[in-house]
């Protein structure tokens, strides 16, 4: 942690959250953000809290204490990482219908969800021949890294997951009553909500990785873990490697897809303008705009570097 000034905290909690308390908490957090170097994204809804924040340790401590107070000291499922640089541009606080959008209002993860499996017992569960493993993340996240032999629902967003369950899940089950269903995601929130959905639909033996991939990589040494590749994250780092350091991926600023070092060597790739994912998505006028934007970004970087040297 030496030399790393910014503390990054990912958190979530499902609990009944009253609207007046949400509005009050948002106001207090915006005030803290205005007075301090706090950045990140927080989402509040009647079902709880979700988000990732970045700041120096003393500011993070203030925010976490405040969130604990409003969550009535419920478990915030906190995961901590560190960085030399800010990983968000600014602080955003959003009030939504759901803290992670699935679009199934009749489920209640705070009252009914699957069984947590901690990192130490996850390998044993997913190696069991009577277990199927489901990655509940989006297809572009899965392409960056996932667990061995896991099922990819190939969803563009989490709200497509219920349809995949209805259309495809049973085809992967030898026995609906006895097969273990183990699910995982980045930090735990999506797979927890997914277990609530499956229990509502009558599935048995539902498990989810406590703390998600991030906690697993923090707990399990590289030589023993079964995660392959890097873990996509929704901030400037793009992806984290097995040591939870910034990985090798960048973002295509045209389409927002993660691109590897190998992807950047492909003939279709033009920094800030296009990649092989979006080669057919944009017009020539779009690419001209992207090219001009990239030139401005490059000029700004050169200018900042010159100021720093002077």
From Swiss-Prot:
Sorted UniProt keywords: Oxidoreductase, tRNA processing
Domain Rhodanese: from-to ranges: 127-225
Domain of life: Bacteria
GO annotation terms (biological process): tRNA modification
Any one GO MF annotation of this record: oxidoreductase activity, acting on paired donors, with incorporation or reduction of molecular oxygen
Pfam assignment, any one: Rhodanese
Active site: 185
EC category name: oxidoreductase
EC number: 1.14.-.-
Gene3D superfamilies to which the protein is assigned, alphabetical: 3.30.70.100, Rhodanese-like domain
Catalytic activity: uridine(34) in tRNA + AH2 + O2 = 5-hydroxyuridine(34) in tRNA + A + H2O
Family membership: Belongs to the TrhO family.
Role noted for this protein: Catalyzes oxygen-dependent 5-hydroxyuridine (ho5U) modification at position 34 in tRNAs.
Protein name: tRNA uridine(34) hydroxylase
Taxonomic classification: Bacteria, Bacillati, Cyanobacteriota, Cyanophyceae, Synechococcales
Gene responsible for this protein: trhO
């Amino acid at each position: 942690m030496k030399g790393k000034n910014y503390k990054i905290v990912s958190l979530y909690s499902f609990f009944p959250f009253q609207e007046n308390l949400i509005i009050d908490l948002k106001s207090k957090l915006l005030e803290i953000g205005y007075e301090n170097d706090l950045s990140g994204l927080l989402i509040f809804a009647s079902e709880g809290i979700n988000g990732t924040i970045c700041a120096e340790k003393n500011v993070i401590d203030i925010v976490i204490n405040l969130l604990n107070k409003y969550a009535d000291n419920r478990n915030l499922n906190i995961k901590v990482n560190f960085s030399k640089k800010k990983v968000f541009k600014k602080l955003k606080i959003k009030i939504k219908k759901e803290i992670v959008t699935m679009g199934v209002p009749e489920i209640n993860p705070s009252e009914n969800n699957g069984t947590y499996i901690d990192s130490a017992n996850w390998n044993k569960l997913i190696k069991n021949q009577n277990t199927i493993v489901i990655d509940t993340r989006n297809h572009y996240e899965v392409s960056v890294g996932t667990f061995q032999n896991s099922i990819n629902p190939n969803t563009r967003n989490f709200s497509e997951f219920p349809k995949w369950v209805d259309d495809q899940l049973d085809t992967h089950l030898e026995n609906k009553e006895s097969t273990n269903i183990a699910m995982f995601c980045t930090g735990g929130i999506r797979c927890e909500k997914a277990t609530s959905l499956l229990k509502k639909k009558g599935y048995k033996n539902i498990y989810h990785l406590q703390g998600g991939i991030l906690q697993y990589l923090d707990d399990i040494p590289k030589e023993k873990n079964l995660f392959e590749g890097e873990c996509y994250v929704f901030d400037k780092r793009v992806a984290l490697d097995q040591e939870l350091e910034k990985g090798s991926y960048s973002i295509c600023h045209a389409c927002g897809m993660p691109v590897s070092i190998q992807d950047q060597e492909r003939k279709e790739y033009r920094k800030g303008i296009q990649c092989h994912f979006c080669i057919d998505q944009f017009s020539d006028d779009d690419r001209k705009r992207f090219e001009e934007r990239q030139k401005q970004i490059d000029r700004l970087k050169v200018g900042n570097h010159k100021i720093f040297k002077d």
